[in-house]
């Protein structure tokens, strides 16, 4: 009779080949999951677009506040010396001597001052991509953005953001903008699936130092599918196909709800928006993250992100009456004196090469939001808990549209 291997030994035999295949060969680049090695020569298109003092200010205050950028970037008054990875030839990037000598970056997007609004069309000439957050549909449970109480209408973020996106698209087009959606239905835009990502999942767990198990491997493969592969594909659509002036990322926030079949509802309900930046030293170890950070910095996205996000935050706060969410962790820093604006290193707002307005209003599992979701979308106003309110989806879309009109429509002034 054959002796059966213990389950742990069998798992090691199954996982070891995946790790061996995933192991990088030799020295060189350390990449984040599913990333391709960047072409550092493309940074030369940013020659002379920024001064050394402004470069350092953005690194210190926005993109890498912990100072770990100094391991990879050296600044002199006339040039930036950028190290792609250990042992690589540095990229020498000429810098402008004065602010008045800076050049306009070579990029596909236009900032607000490069276009002129028309009477009644405050967004004329503006190209906008709307990114409805998450996947929804059959993947909603996998991505843990779904819950249901009894036989009530399920609360599903991917479906909710898509409803808002379709309403917002019509409003922005009526204001003169050209508008695209990164997805027009529930589901994935990427052809990747978890069963094709086991090797990448094994490498990701190895880098984290996480213990290997069949369950962890399957969970990580799923995470790489819906959170990494999907976002990378949307970034490809934005940067290579749509090439907009702005991306509007639509999300709903949430507090911990426990068992999605028996979720906990909360009284908390709040609002915030996220800007790109706030990278840590560990994140900066990834060559692709350093590269995409520099593309955002040198492309001049921060000023535009800050201005547009300020306007949208103001409009959302007025429309919803929500208080600002406050982070109490090192992975987020305030973007300005505006309590609604925060800086975080998220994959989406880092990979999109143009400015991004990343919205996180409402708490999906708050009692008020749950009650409004049960009413679905509707025109006009209804009595909700003694208040006359529009549908939560139209309130969201109206406020974002108004904020963008306030910011871009005032460009001529």
Roles of regions detected by a PLM:
Residues 3-14:
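Bacterial N-terminal signal peptides that target proteins for export
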Residues 8-9, 18, 240, 257:
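A periodicity- and composition-biased signal for non-globular, repetitive helical segments
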């Amino acid at each position: 009779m054959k002796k059966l291997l213990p389950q742990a030994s069998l798992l090691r035999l199954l996982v070891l080949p995946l790790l061996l295949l995933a192991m990088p060969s030799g020295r060189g680049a350390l990449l984040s999951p599913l990333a391709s090695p960047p072409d550092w020569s493309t940074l030369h298109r940013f020659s002379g677009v920024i001064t050394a003092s402004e470069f350092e200010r953005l690194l210190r205050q926005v993109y890498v506040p912990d100072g770990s950028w100094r391991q990879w970037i050296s600044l002199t008054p006339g040039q930036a010396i950028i190290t792609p990875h250990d042992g690589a030839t540095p990229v020498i990037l000429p810098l402008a001597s004065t602010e008045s000598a800076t050049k306009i970056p070579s990029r596909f997007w236009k900032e607000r001052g490069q276009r002129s609004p028309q009477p009644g069309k405050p967004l004329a000439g503006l190209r906008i991509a709307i990114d409805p957050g998450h996947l929804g549909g059959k993947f909603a449970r996998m991505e843990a953005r779904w819950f249901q109480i009894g036989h009530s209408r399920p609360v599903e973020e991917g479906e909710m953001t898509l409803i808002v996106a379709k309403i917002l698209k019509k409003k922005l087009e009526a204001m003169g903008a050209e508008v695209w959606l990164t997805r027009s239905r529930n589901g994935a835009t990427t052809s990747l699936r978890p069963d094709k990502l086991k090797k990448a999942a094994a490498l990701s767990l190895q880098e984290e130092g996480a213990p290997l198990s069949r369950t962890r491997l399957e969970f990580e493969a799923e995470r790489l599918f819906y959170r990494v592969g999907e976002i990378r594909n949307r970034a490809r659509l934005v940067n290579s196909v749509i090439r907009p002036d702005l991306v509007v990322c639509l999300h709903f926030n949430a507090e911990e709800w426990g068992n999605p079949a028996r979720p906990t509802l909360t009284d908390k309900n709040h609002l915030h928006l996220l800007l790109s930046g706030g990278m840590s030293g560990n994140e900066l170890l990834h060559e692709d993250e350093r590269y995409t950070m520099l593309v955002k910095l040198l492309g001049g996205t921060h000023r535009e992100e800050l201005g547009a996000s300020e306007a949208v935050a103001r409009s959302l706060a007025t429309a919803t009456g929500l208080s600002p969410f406050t982070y109490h962790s090192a992975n987020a820093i305030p973007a300005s004196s505006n309590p609604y604006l925060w800086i975080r290193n998220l994959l989406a707002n880092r990979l999109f090469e143009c400015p991004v307005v990343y919205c996180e209003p409402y708490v999906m599992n708050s009692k008020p939001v749950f009650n409004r979701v049960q009413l679905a979308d509707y025109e006009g106003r209804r009595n909700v808990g003694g208040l006359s309110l529009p549908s939560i989806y139209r309130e969201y879309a109206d406020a974002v549209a108004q904020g963008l009109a306030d910011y871009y429509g005032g460009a001529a002034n």
